[in-house]
Amino acid sequence: MTEQAEDALPIRFTDAAASKVKTLLEEEENDALKLRVYVTGGGCSGFQYGFTFDEKVNEGDFTVEKQGVQLVVDPMSLQYLVGGEVDYTSGLEGSRFFVKNPNATTTCGCGASFSV
């Protein structure tokens, strides 16, 4: 996919995140798994991000494929994530998937929750 085509997507999936998903799927030996990102109520800022592995793509789900792995977002969560990016980081504070969300007006210190 070209960079221009990626920019047109409602949510981006970085190379770092896709690479980590690929590694985890190889360890699980289950190519049917996809990384699902979702938004739920809660956290210190009102909404929080969640990540899970899921074998299913439900009707209406949005998917992005990169490096042979898929990111899946349900329609309700996608409305809060449009223009965002799912990334992965590893450092002194630990390793995690995270969302860069331009729609968030405030975020908590750890970046796991936000408000719009």
From Swiss-Prot:
Binding residue positions for iron-sulfur cluster: 44, 108, 110
Keyword list (alphabetical) reads:
Iron, Iron-sulfur, Metal-binding
Coiled-coil residue windows: none
User: Could you tell me which InterPro entries the record lists for this protein?
Assistant: FeS_biogenesis (IPR000361), FeS_cluster_insertion (IPR016092), FeS_cluster_insertion_CS (IPR017870), FeS_cluster_insertion_RrpA (IPR023063), HesB-like_dom_sf (IPR035903)
- Note the PROSITE patterns from the entry: HESB (PS01152)
Asked if the record carries the keyword Isomerase, the reply is no
Q: How is the cofactor bound?
A: Binds 1 iron-sulfur cluster per subunit.
A Pfam family recorded for this sequence: Fe-S_biosyn
Domain of life per record: Bacteria
Kindly list the cysteine pairs connected by disulfide bridges: none
Q: Please list the cofactors this protein needs.
A: iron-sulfur cluster
Provide the family line. Answer: Belongs to the HesB/IscA family.
Functionally, this protein is described as follows: Required for insertion of 4Fe-4S clusters for at least IspG.
- Which protein, by its recorded name, is this? Iron-sulfur cluster insertion protein ErpA
What is the originating organism of this protein?
Shewanella pealeana (strain ATCC 700345 / ANG-SQ1)
Which gene underlies this protein? erpA
